[in-house]
UniProtKB/Swiss-Prot annotation:
It comes from Macrococcus caseolyticus (strain JCSC5402) (Macrococcoides caseolyticum). HAMAP family: UPF0398. This is UPF0398 protein MCCL_1095. Pfam families: YpsA. Gene3D superfamilies: 3.40.50.450. Belongs to the UPF0398 family. Disulfide bonds: none annotated. The lineage of its organism: Bacteria, Bacillati, Bacillota, Bacilli, Bacillales. InterPro entries: YspA.
Length: 183
């Protein structure tokens, strides 16, 4: 697999209100381990749509991994200026990530016009990647549930890899990580 899309929860959906919260560190460590496995199997491109939360945390991980691996980061936003209504801190954070991305574009060369832009971008990304890592748990419903159904429908008609990460997967990882640190 050469290209993968990563998406999932927004920070507030996980009760995360600051990137310095310890949960963010564990999510990034988990994503780093997962991405290393994909990179060692031939992954070249990681694609995100530039949303706060799992997507930008994954972007941070990719930027770190670029120092050791030949992997690239692409940001394909649904529309122009998608981050313009974010607070100043989040805009700065986003711009710092964009400065290190290998490719940035918008699926729609226009400002926000409607929800169709998100659906069209999701479809474009699915059509142009070979798999998705979806950080989502049916036990903890939130915004990714809509994409999950689109993803399942797409994969049922196409040869496409789905890697769903649940909160239990993350919890298991954290427990193993903590045990390993004890030794």
């Amino acid at each position: 697999m050469k290209s993968i899309y990563i998406t999932g929860y927004k920070p507030y959906e996980l009760n995360i209100f600051n990137n310095k919260q310890p949960e963010v560190r564990y999510i990034k460590l988990f994503l780093q381990q997962k991405l290393k496995e994909y990179i060692e199997d031939g992954l070249e491109w990681v694609i995100i749509e530039g949303q706060l939360g799992v997507e930008l945390w994954a972007a941070e991980v990719v930027i770190r991994l670029k120092k050791m691996y030949d992997v690239k980061l692409s940001i394909i936003t649904p529309f122009l200026e998608h981050h313009s209504k974010w607070n100043e801190e989040n805009q700065l954070y986003y711009n710092q990530i964009c400065a290190r991305a290998d490719f940035i574009t918008s699926a729609h060369n226009d400002i926000y016009r409607g929800g169709f832009q998100f659906r069209n971008t999701d479809q474009f990304v699915l059509d142009n990647t070979e798999g998705t890592i979806l950080f989502y748990d049916d036990e903890h419903e939130a915004s990714p549930k809509f994409f999950k159904q689109t993803l399942i429908d797409f994969a049922s008609e196409n040869q496409y890899n789905i890697d769903v990460v649940t909160l239990e997967d993350l919890s298991d990882f954290v427990n193993e990580y903590m045990r390993a640190k004890e030794y």
